[in-house]
Amino acid sequence: MDHDDALVGRLLTRREAVRLMGVAGAAGLFGSNLLAAQDRTTTCVVRPELIEGPYFLDASSNRSDIRVDASSGKARDGVPLIVTLGVAQVTAGQCSPLPKALVHMWQCDAVGVYSGVSDPQIGSGNPQDNALRGTQQTDTSGIARFTTIYPGWYRGRAVHIHFKIRTEASGQAYEYTSQLFFPETLTDEIHARAPYAQHGRRDTMNERDMIYREAGEQLLLRPTKTSSGYEAPLSLALDLSDAAVGRSDAEGMRGRGGRGRGGRGRGGL
């Protein structure tokens, strides 16, 4: 189903965003490098919030390469992936890069395990383990870049990465939380390799994932192959005047997220 022209809450649609700033402005907002692998008309789209889930840790290290566990010095095995987020702000009908925003990113490893949590099914059990978790501050162009691995899977969820953006650019604390998803064909190809293959075939495709079905197509990455792995850019805009979106996830007991309300489900969120 094509959600390009469907409203999600107060979100701008792709068509509205293009009218807002014009195609030329959309192409130039973050520069051609970020947008080379994606549709340039999506630059100023306000994308949906989705649920935070139970595995966010607020003590993530400030670093770009999040593959290494700082406590052991060991890197998580997996196909290298560079995720580049271009963050903009919508103010008075104009879209501009948002500098100095704090971007958190966290995900499971190639066999579906989250670092730093004690969940017996998908947690590493070591509270000092911080692999595949980290934060970056957006630069003057609104860019934050993470070097990670293509994520694995765990029961009940499609393959995904969590991220959170915090800023006080509007004069008060603003927090946006969502998730990134991946094309099925690429996931099948990568998960057939080691170390992913040892975990078996995933049990939940995108269209069967309760979070993806809410708005996942608007947060679907389009990774492109590089000499060492893959890279995946995504641009998104924040409406800092939207207090409902900008309130802390802690206020909603980590169950808030656009229309993504709900409990932990079969295997965490």
Residue ranges with predicted function:
Residues 256-269:
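Long, low-complexity intrinsically disordered regions enriched in Ser/Thr, Asp/Glu, Pro/Gly
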